[in-house]
């Protein structure tokens, strides 16, 4: 019991960070299995699952587990807790008990989200939970959607508490002689991420509370029959939802900078101050571009022009970061160890995802491509090959520091190449499916789309094998 009580009563930032990593990895495996179920359904025309409601429930659970229970806990909670105090020269976080609280709120949140999918047909709303029709009572009348909303509320409480802790630690624990500009880039990434979460999460909480009032207390915030407006929910959700995608990738930017500096054997990353201001710019611009998710809801031409222009503007600070990483690599004696491979893969595939993002930022093109597999391919290139690649780069790089053990270099490289080929084979064909007009979140399709869906399923099978190799690699270490 003594060994278990260490974890139940942990206040140390290292113990809490380890628990975040364990929860995140478990959720990542769960989310991957759900994606494999989706790919099996889409591997050939016709239905394999009992109904489309079950398929939509799988889509919803996959998205929420991957975003709120995998990428955020690992990048922000795991690496943040382990590295932030050490990079600032502190013995712990400013509020160790708040740190513990922010972790222990997450397992109940994950429990509510998972349980919701075993009630009725699950919550088939997608992670966006659009009301009228998807999450409205006539169409999602059971308790499953309510449990999903409560689970998201708990995840939001956890992230808010965590963000307060990180910001206070960043501002107060740092030595007064140690200027903020010279803080490591990962520290700055966490500071910007915490700011994004603190500003955007209350808006999501308000939107979800209004939604649950509509569902259970006869209000009509979003119901047109009672004078409400469903587009209001989209504005509230995407004001949170777009900063959220930067929350997922910014800590990864910081990790990539640190891993690159180590393996290029340079003193610092190229243009480190510009990199810092680029992250701040991305954070600020992230709050004023949410409308690009809503081009098809009836925004007027001037509004769509504004959101197109500002969305393209985000490519500037992002380009500063990408070219600074390339300049850091230039002229260095790069050792092709596993973390370096993950970083190089990240730079290539994140750039690819950014290019498709600029294409989708055009309102005239997005009207045609909205809710097709082109959008799925775009954000999976940014997340499945962006955020996840940074997680593996950081994890393999810092694993000896965390555990005093080493991964097998051969297995680590093999894991990278198998994953790299697998995710590309999974998501690259989806660009063609989207350009051909295949809609997302639909479990069946005409025979016309069979060829590229088959390749996509083969790629997903390769990713499943690579994850098995990762588990073996972990076990062997």
Swiss-Prot record:
Membrane spanning residue stretches: 16-36, 64-84, 101-121, 149-171, 185-205, 236-256, 269-289, 309-329, 340-360, 382-402, 416-436, 455-475
Principal localisation: mitochondrion
Cross-link 1'-histidyl-3'-tyrosine (His-Tyr): residue positions: 242-246
Annotated positions binding Ca(2+): 41, 46, 443
Membrane keyword on record: yes
GO cellular component: mitochondrial inner membrane; respiratory chain complex IV
Membrane topology: Multi-pass membrane protein
Cofactor needs: heme; Cu cation
PROSITE patterns cross-referenced by the UniProt entry: COX1, COX1_CUB
Subcellular location: Mitochondrion inner membrane
Chain sites annotated for binding heme a3: 378
Keyword Amino-acid biosynthesis carried by entry: no
Metabolic or biological pathway, per its Swiss-Prot or TrEMBL entry: Energy metabolism; oxidative phosphorylation
Domain of life: Eukaryota
Catalysed reactions, as listed in the record: 4 Fe(II)-[cytochrome c] + O2 + 8 H(+)(in) = 4 Fe(III)-[cytochrome c] + 2 H2O + 4 H(+)(out)
InterPro entries attached to this UniProt entry: Cyt_c_oxase-like_su1_dom, Cyt_c_oxase-like_su1_sf, Cyt_C_Oxase_1, Cyt_c_Oxase_su1_BS, Cyt_c_oxase_su1_dom
Binding, O2: 246
Annotated keywords: Calcium, Copper, Electron transport, Heme, Iron, Magnesium, Membrane, Metal-binding, Mitochondrion, Mitochondrion inner membrane, Respiratory chain, Translocase, Transmembrane, Transmembrane helix, Transport
Bound cofactor: record note: Binds 2 heme A groups non-covalently per subunit.
Binding site residues for Fe(II)-heme a: 62, 380
Subunit structure: Component of the cytochrome c oxidase (complex IV, CIV), a multisubunit enzyme composed of a catalytic core of 3 subunits and several supernumerary subunits. The complex exists as a monomer or a dimer and forms supercomplexes (SCs) in the inner mitochondrial membrane with ubiquinol-cytochrome c oxidoreductase (cytochrome b-c1 complex, complex III, CIII).
Function: Component of the cytochrome c oxidase, the last enzyme in the mitochondrial electron transport chain which drives oxidative phosphorylation. The respiratory chain contains 3 multisubunit complexes succinate dehydrogenase (complex II, CII), ubiquinol-cytochrome c oxidoreductase (cytochrome b-c1 complex, complex III, CIII) and cytochrome c oxidase (complex IV, CIV), that cooperate to transfer electrons derived from NADH and succinate to molecular oxygen, creating an electrochemical gradient over the inner membrane that drives transmembrane transport and the ATP synthase.
Family: Belongs to the heme-copper respiratory oxidase family.
Protein name as it appears in the record: Cytochrome c oxidase subunit 1
Taxonomic placement: Eukaryota, Metazoa, Spiralia, Lophotrochozoa, Mollusca
């Amino acid at each position: 019991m003594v060994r278990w009580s260490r974890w139940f009563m942990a206040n140390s930032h290292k113990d809490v960070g380890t628990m975040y990593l364990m929860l995140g990895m478990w959720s990542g495996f769960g989310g991957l299995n759900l994606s494999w179920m989706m790919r099996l359904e889409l591997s050939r025309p016709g239905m394999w699952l009992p109904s489309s409601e079950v398929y939509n429930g799988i889509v919803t659970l996959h998205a929420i587990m991957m975003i709120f229970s995998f990428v955020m806990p690992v990048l922000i909670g795991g690496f943040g807790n382990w590295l932030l105090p050490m990079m600032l020269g502190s013995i712990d976080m400013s509020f160790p008990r708040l740190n513990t609280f922010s972790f222990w709120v997450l397992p109940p949140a994950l429990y509510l989200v998972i349980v919701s999918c075993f009630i009725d047909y699950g919550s088939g709303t997608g992670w966006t939970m659009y009301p009228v029709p998807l999450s409205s009572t006539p169409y999602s009348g059971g308790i499953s959607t309510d449990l999903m909303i409560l689970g998201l509320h708990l995840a939001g409480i956890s992230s808010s508490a965590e963000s307060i802790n990180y910001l206070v630690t960043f501002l107060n624990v740092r030595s007064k002689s140690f200027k903020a500009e010279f803080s490591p880039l990962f520290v700055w990434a966490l500071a910007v991420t915490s700011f994004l979460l603190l500003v955007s999460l209350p808006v999501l909480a308000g939107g979800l509370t209004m939604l649950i009032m509509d569902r259970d207390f006869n209000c009509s915030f979003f119901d047109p029959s009672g004078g409400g407006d469903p587009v209001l929910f989209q504005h509230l959700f995407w004001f949170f939802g777009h900063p959220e995608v930067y929350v997922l990738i910014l800590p990864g930017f910081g990790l990539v900078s640190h891993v690159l500096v180590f393996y290029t054997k340079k003193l610092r990353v190229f243009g480190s101050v510009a990199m810092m201001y680029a992250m701040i710019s991305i954070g600020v611009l992230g709050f004023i571009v949410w409308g690009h998710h809503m081009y098809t809801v009836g925004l007027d031409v001037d509004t769509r022009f504004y959101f197109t222009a500002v969305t393209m503007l985000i490519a500037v600070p992002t380009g500063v970061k990408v070219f600074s990483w390339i300049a850091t690599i230039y002229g260095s004696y790069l050792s092709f160890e596993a973390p370096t491979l993950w970083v190089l893969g990240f730079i290539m595939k994140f750039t690819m995802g950014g290019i498709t993002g600029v294409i989708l930022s055009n309102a005239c093109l997005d009207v045609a491509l909205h809710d097709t597999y082109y959008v799925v391919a775009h954000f999976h290139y940014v997340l499945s090959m962006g955020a996840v690649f940074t997680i593996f780069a950081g994890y393999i790089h810092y694993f000896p520091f965390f555990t005093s053990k080493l991964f097998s270099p051969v297995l680590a490289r093999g894991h990278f190449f198998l994953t790299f080929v697998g995710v590309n084979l999974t998501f690259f064909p989806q660009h063609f499916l989207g350009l051909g007009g295949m809609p997302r979140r639909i479990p069946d399709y005409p025979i016309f789309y069979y060829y590229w869906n088959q390749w996509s399923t083969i790629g997903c099978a390769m990713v499943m094998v690579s994850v098995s190799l990762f588990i073996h690699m972990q076990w062997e270490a």
